[in-house]
């Protein structure tokens, strides 16, 4: 991330950081949140390097446990259009496969039972994966979940991204969520500044 920070966009830096966290977590067995914490500490304590400010800005938006770059992209699209933050790859209560393994969702607002699932090509071409996805989604819809399934086409350009975000915003609103939808997406830089301001406000309030 250090080496790339001065050569890629802020969005790409967030996606790269989330991919690194997932890779380290899988290879080492460490919890993703601990890896993220270590990454933040490493960047904060590192001597100055070209791109350090960009790294620290990107880390305002990075989440642990995002399992694919396209999921990272989809999550950022939703945030840039004003949707509330969501949990990533979270387990759903009382929902398990026959093996006993808990069912999880890529991006989810658990309180409102709305979720987004990203399907790469392997979800379509791998019969086992396709059947597994179908079984999971049928089960979760029976439990009252609204599940929006997207592919790479849904986040390919600004128009597609806006339509995707509007669709999710509509479903959240129908479930009682207050959504401040932005037709024109914020830049990733604007989003990072907003997150930083919100974090500062939260810290001030908790200190009182």
State what each model feature region is.
Residues 1-36:
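Hydrophobic alpha-helical segments and helix pairs
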Residues 25-208:
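Surface segments flanking catalytic/ligand-binding clefts of nucleic-acid enzymes
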């Amino acid at each position: 991330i250090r080496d790339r920070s001065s050569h890629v966009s802020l969005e790409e830096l967030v996606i790269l950081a989330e991919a690194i966290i997932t890779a380290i977590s899988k290879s080492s067995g460490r919890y993703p949140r601990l890896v993220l914490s270590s990454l933040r500490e490493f960047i904060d304590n590192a001597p100055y390097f070209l791109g350090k400010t960009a790294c620290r800005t990107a880390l305002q938006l990075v989440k642990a446990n995002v399992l694919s770059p396209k999921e990272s992209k989809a999550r950022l699209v939703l945030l840039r259009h004003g949707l509330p933050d969501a949990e990533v790859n979270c387990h759903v209560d009382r929902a398990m496969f026959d093996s006993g393994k808990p069912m999880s969702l890529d991006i989810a607002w658990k309180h409102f039972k709305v979720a987004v699932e990203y399907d790469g090509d392997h979800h379509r071409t791998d019969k086992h994966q396709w059947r597994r996805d179908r079984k999971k989604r049928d089960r979760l819809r029976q439990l009252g979940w609204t599940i929006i399934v997207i592919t790479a086409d849904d986040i390919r350009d600004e128009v597609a991204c806006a339509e995707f975000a509007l669709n999710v915003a509509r479903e959240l609103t129908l479930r009682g969520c207050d959504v401040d939808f932005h037709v024109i997406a914020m830049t990733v830089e604007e989003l990072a500044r907003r997150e930083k301001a919100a974090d500062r406000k939260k810290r001030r309030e908790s200190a009182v």
